[in-house]
C-alpha cells in the first residue's frame, strides 16, 4: 500500500494509534461521537458505502438513490479506488 507521505505527521500517527486501540463498536461510537461532528461521521460512513457499491458494480444512479451521495462524492471515491492507496479495500 502506497501512502502519500505529505499526509504523514505525528498528529495523524497519534489519531490512528488511538483508533487502533478501540476494541468494540460501542467504543467506536463513543470515540467518533466525541471527535467528529454528526455530519463528518455521516460523510465517512457514506463514502465507505459508496466504495462498497462501486466495487459491486452499482451504477452512479443507484448509488445516488440509495446513499444520497452526490455524483462528485461518488467520482472522488471511484478515483481513490482506481488510483488511491488501497485504503478502501
Task: Place the predicted regions along the sequence by residue.
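Short, solvent-exposed alpha-helical "recognition" segments
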Residues: 79-89
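Short alpha-helical "recognition helix" segments of helix-turn-helix
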Residues: 62-67, 74
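Short helix-capping/linker segments at secondary-structure and domain boundaries
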Residues: 57-64, 86
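General nucleic-acid-binding
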Residues: 1-22
